[in-house]
Amino acid sequence: MDALYKAGKFKRFGLSNFLPAQVQELYDCCKENNYVLPTVFQGMYSPVTRHSEADLIPLCRKLGISYNAYSPIAGGFLVKTVEAMKKGGVGRWDPNHLAGKLYHSLYNRPKMLEGLQQWEDIANDAGLGKAEMAFRYITYHSVLDGDKGDGIVIGATKPEQLEQALLVIEKGPLEQSVAKMIDAIWETVKDDAPYDTYQGQDRKESL
């Protein structure tokens, strides 16, 4: 990796889906050997997947690594209904396919579904789209800090989806009362919430 960096093949060394201990170990190895240091981390982060606030993001702050949040709408979970989740799904949410099995293992859990119902109720009462609420919350009410190089990875299959996401983000912060209700959802879901896409619940045993 260091040779590729010195050859000008990339500008920043990034990590993704690492545990905090792994980030520290890799950083220390790079430091000791004068290798290029990681300066950006891409990690799961949404209103219902916030475990990284407790350890990973603080570690990134200490090491000078910016944090780019992927799945700000939790892989599409936050735009679904509880009824739809219980029925299964189509596309990447089809439980008969590998990706669908993964997504259901991450999100189709009792506390997550309870939080999803709360999410829908808040959106309906506030007159907001569920995706809009997620994008605006993560942008303006989370621990992400643009001054530290943090950002959001917006997944879109069509240009129109990206444009729509950017438009709702430009609306600015949510009403403080709405943001507080969203904060409260975390207390509902945190025991069932996944840590990242590939380690899911397994990280509990590694902490």
Protein language model annotation of sequence segments:
Residues 1-2, 23-27, 57, 116, ...:
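Generic structural signal for well-ordered alpha-helices
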Residues 19, 45-49, 71-82, 137, ...:
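Glycine-rich beta-alpha junction loops
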Residues 62, 86-114, 118-121, 125, ...:
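Terminal-tail/helix-coil boundary detector
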Residues 52-97, 129:
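Aromatic-lined glycan-binding groove of carbohydrate-active enzymes
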Residues 13, 41, 60, 67-70, ...:
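Conserved, mostly hydrophobic/aromatic
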Residues 1-48, 55:
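Glycine/proline-rich, positively charged
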Residues 9, 29-39, 60-68, 144, ...:
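Glycine-enriched alpha-helix->loop->beta-strand junction motifs that scaffold or abut catalytic
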